[in-house]
Structures are given as structure tokens and as C-alpha cells.
Regions:
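Short, charged helix-capping/linker segments at alpha-helix termini
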Residues: 14-23, 33-52, 159, 182-186
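Internal acidic/polar
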Residues: 6, 86, 94-117
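Sigma70-family region 2
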Residues: 14-15, 41, 54-69
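C-terminal edge and immediately downstream basic/flexible tail or linker adjoining helix-turn-helix-like DNA-binding
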Residues: 1-3, 12, 139, 153-156, ...
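Arg/Lys-rich amphipathic alpha helix in sigma70-family domain 2
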Residues: 63, 78-98
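Helix-turn-helix DNA-binding module
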Residues: 125-128, 132-136, 144-161
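N-terminal module of bacterial RNA polymerase sigma factors
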Residues: 1-30, 144, 149, 182, ...
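Structural recognition of an alpha-helix C-terminal capping motif at a helix-to-coil junction
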Residues: 34, 48-55, 70-82
């Protein structure tokens, strides 16, 4: 889609045109669903966040100033990412626990350097198998490139807690990736 078409869609969205809103949603929903899947474990949560995000996007559209397609994508992605983070924070009150000692014992046995290429599906599966809070922190740090301090501020916790959570997430992911590698070479 060229810039002129996108300018027209954004302009119509600002006026509340539902056809333009549908077009904008269709343009970005698959990419934004992928963003949601990195943070949230269930399709239901992803769909809820995506819906809430686009409702928020359409409400805020009147104050949005179109620059280019890349800026629009970044703006939409930021809103979706923030919605994901807020959803995870709301679920924080639910108890989660990880038997990290069990994983550390396994990791000690398999510290070898792995030269195995993982598919995107394998990586997403591993990421979805770690606790939601650890996944959130890992995504914010590795994918969204937030600093530890920024994550601590956003999640209202200490930098040391974030560092510990990152370490736990890495260990859990490493353990799962080693298991996948071992299954592949059997």
C-alpha cells in the first residue's frame, strides 16, 4: 500500500469511517497478533488485547499526525505492546511459581554449546512455555529493547528483580531449547 492510500485511510479513520477502520485493522491485525503472541499465552487473551488496542487506536486517531507508514506501524505497535504489558500486570496478582532448582540441575548437565538452528515455531513454543511474567520481561528486554531500569519502572519493581527474572527466563528457555535439540538428534 502506498503512502497516499494510507494517508487517506488515516484521514477517514479520524472521521470515524468504519470502512477505513476495518481496512486499517486488516492491514495490521496479523502483525499485531504476532506481537501479542510474544507476550500472552492464550489466543483468547491475544484477541482481547488486539480488540482493546484497536479500539484505543481508533479513539486516539483524532490526535494522531500521519508522518509515514513506518511511524504509523510503530505507533500501533506501541499501543498493542502497552496493552499486552497492562494485561500481564493485571494477571500479576495470580500466583505463579517456578521450580527453578529443577531446571538449574538439568542445565548443569547440559551446558554444552549448541550449534543447532531453531525454527521460529520452536522458539515461540519455548517462549510460550515459560511463565507469563518471565515472558513479559524477556520480551521487553530482548525484543522491545527496553533497558532493565525502564522495565523496572514500567512493572513497578526493582532492577534486581528484573535481572533475576531475566536470568530465570534465559535458563528456562535454554533448558527447553536443549530438549528440542536432543529430540531432533535422536
Amino acid at each position: 500500500m502506498n503512502n497516499e492510500d494510507l494517508v487517506n485511510i488515516v484521514s477517514l479513520c479520524k472521521k470515524g469511517n468504519t470502512d477505513a477502520q476495518k481496512q486499517l485493522f486488516c492491514l495490521y491485525n496479523k502483525q499485531m497478533m504476532f506481537v501479542c503472541r510474544r507476550y500472552l499465552s492464550t489466543n483468547e487473551d491475544c484477541n482481547d488485547v488486539l480488540t482493546d488496542s484497536f479500539l484505543q487506536i481508533f479513539k486516539a486517531m483524532s490526535s494522531y499526525r500521519f508522518i509515514n507508514e513506518k511511524a504509523l506501524y510503530s505507533w500501533i505497535r506501541t499501543i498493542v505492546t502497552n496493552q499486552c504489558i497492562n494485561t500481564v500486570k493485571k494477571k500479576q496478582h495470580e500466583k505463579f511459581s517456578v521450580d527453578i532448582e529443577q531446571y538449574e540441575q538439568t542445565l548443569d548437565k547440559t551446558e554444552e554449546q549448541v550449534e543447532y538452528e531453531y525454527t521460529q515455531e520452536e522458539l515461540m513454543l519455548c517462549l510460550n512455555n515459560i511463565p507469563e511474567r518471565l515472558r513479559l520481561i524477556f520480551n521487553m528486554y530482548v525484543i522491545e529493547e527496553y533497558s532493565i531500569k525502564e522495565i523496572a519502572i514500567r512493572l513497578e519493581t526493582s532492577a534486581n528483580t528484573i535481572k533475576t527474572s531475566l536470568s530465570q527466563a534465559r535458563n528456562l528457555l535454554k533448558h527447553q531449547l536443549v530438549q528440542i535439540k536432543n529430540k531432533s538428534f535422536r
